[in-house]
């Protein structure tokens, strides 16, 4: 019997931790991009084209 117990399962724990951290960060950053950048840009574009259509309808 050795004085120090062997380290078992460390690779599996490391892989699971890496996957969990990667999925968590990916979800958080993806959500930030979607709600913080993409949605406001799309809303601004939609507002622009709505105003443009209203102006065109008013001219006719």
UniProtKB/Swiss-Prot annotation:
It is a single-pass membrane protein. Component of the cytochrome c oxidase, the last enzyme in the mitochondrial electron transport chain which drives oxidative phosphorylation. The respiratory chain contains 3 multisubunit complexes succinate dehydrogenase (complex II, CII), ubiquinol-cytochrome c oxidoreductase (cytochrome b-c1 complex, complex III, CIII) and cytochrome c oxidase (complex IV, CIV), that cooperate to transfer electrons derived from NADH and succinate to molecular oxygen, creating an electrochemical gradient over the inner membrane that drives transmembrane transport and the ATP synthase. It is found in: Mitochondrion inner membrane. GO terms for cellular component: mitochondrial inner membrane. Pathway: Energy metabolism; oxidative phosphorylation. Residues 1-18 are mitochondrial matrix. InterPro entries: Cyt_c_oxidase_su7a_fun. This is Cytochrome c oxidase subunit 9, mitochondrial. Residues 58-60 form a propeptide. PANTHER family: CYTOCHROME C OXIDASE SUBUNIT 6C, CYTOCHROME C OXIDASE SUBUNIT 7A. The gene is COX9. GO terms for molecular function: oxidoreductase activity. Keywords: Membrane, Mitochondrion, Mitochondrion inner membrane, Oxidoreductase, Transmembrane, Transmembrane helix.
């Amino acid at each position: 019997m050795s004085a120090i117990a062997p380290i078992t399962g460390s690779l599996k724990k490391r892989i699971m931790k890496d996957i969990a951290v990667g999925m968590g960060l990916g979800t958080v950053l993806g959500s930030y991009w979607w709600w913080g950048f993409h949605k406001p840009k799309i809303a601004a574009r939609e507002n622009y084209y709505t105003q443009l259509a209203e102006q065109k309808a008013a001219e006719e």
